[in-house]
Swiss-Prot record:
Organism placement in taxonomy: Eukaryota, Metazoa, Chordata, Craniata, Vertebrata
Protein name: Taste receptor type 2 member 60
Coiled-coil ranges from the UniProt annotation: none
UniProt source species: Pan troglodytes
Residue numbers on the Cytoplasmic membrane side: 29-40, 110-128, 205-234, 286-318
Topological relation to the membrane, as annotated: Multi-pass membrane protein
Length: 318
């Protein structure tokens, strides 16, 4: 998911790496198709009915940001695979990085706001603050979106400034892409400017996300225990509903965790871009990204209704 791994220094010719890159592209296509369906299904309903539940608005926004992000990363992967010796901060990669930085921040913040919304609306804590937030949160949705746009734009500009300065320094000193001096200058800027900025940008929404997810999973876990004590077993509808909700939340949390770790590992250089372990890690990340939209399709009632209507129309039933 990370765009920073596109800094390559030699041709990717290893057969295993080529196979994994092919798998990555296929997984990205699955993720693009899944997020595209979610965006189209909820987006059409939003346009036609002029109204949509706040959680579904956040969901369609998250699906759209995921769709665009996957498309940008896929284009970047193809470009770097075709031009492995390209300078990491050339104009083409700067343009792609600009889009990636904005969409990446958007994905993190939309995921965070969705977790906040689920936590406040679903969790059954008796603290007065939760009751107050339940009544106020829906009205704050526009401000939540505006805040994401402002924060994402601000951090994207800061990233662009750093990337552009490194490219200007490269042109000024007539450095080769893999010159030792050029690498040291780029490494210094990445270590003391880009990396701290990335960690601040990514950690803020991640911290909020984890707090909300822990509260929400704790609340649902308590409810499921109570339901098990008052029912005959796991086949009861109330227990099944809690299990489905927990599975959806856990998949959401696992995707977010894998996403955040991929960002940190790539920024820290733990997995070198040409190392086989890097491509294995990327395959695992994109497997999560491909599976998550499928889980959403079957856990969201509106999306399930769209799927049923599509099936019935294909079968010729009303």
């Amino acid at each position: 998911m990370n765009g920073d791994h596109m800094v390559l220094g030699s041709s990717v010719t290893d057969k295993k790496a080529i196979i994994l890159v092919t798998i990555l592209l296929l997984l990205r296509l699955v993720a693009i198709a899944g997020n595209g369906f979610i965006t189209a299904a909820l987006g059409v309903e939003w346009v036609l009915r002029r109204m949509l539940l706040p959680c579904d608005k956040l969901l369609v926004s998250l699906g759209a940001s995921h769709f665009c992000l996957q498309s940008v990363v896929m284009g970047k992967t193809i470009y770097v695979f075709l031009y492995p010796m390209a300078f990491p901060y050339n104009p083409v990669l700067q343009f792609l990085a600009f889009q990636w930085d904005f969409l990446n921040a958007a994905t993190l913040w939309f995921s965070t706001w969705l977790s906040v919304f689920y936590c406040v609306k679903i969790a059954t804590f008796t603290h007065p603050v939760f009751f107050w937030l339940k009544h106020k949160l829906s009205g704050w949705l526009p401000w939540m979106v505006f805040s994401y746009v402002g924060l994402s734009s601000f951090t994207t500009i800061l990233f662009f400034i750093g990337n552009h300065r490194m490219y200007q320094n490269y042109l000024k000193n007539h450095l080769q892409p893999w010159n030792v001096t050029g690498n040291s200058i780029r490494s210094y800027c990445e270590k003391f400017y880009l990396f701290p900025l990335k960690m601040i940008t990514w950690t803020m929404p991640t911290a909020v996300f984890f707090i909300c997810m822990i509260l929400l999973i704790t609340s649902l876990g308590r409810h499921m225990k109570k339901a098990l004590l008052t029912t005959s077993g796991f086949r009861e509808p109330s227990v099944q509903a809690h299990i489905k909700a927990l599975l959806a939340l856990l998949s959401f949390a696992m995707l977010f965790i894998s996403y955040f770790l991929s960002l940190v590992f790539s920024a820290a250089g733990i997995f070198p871009p040409l190392d086989f372990k890097f491509w294995v890690w990327e395959s695992v990340i994109y497997l999560c990204a491909a599976v998550h939209p499928i889980i959403l399709l079957f856990s969201n009632c509106r999306l399930r209704a769209v799927l049923k209507s599509r099936r019935s129309s294909r079968c010729g039933t009303p």
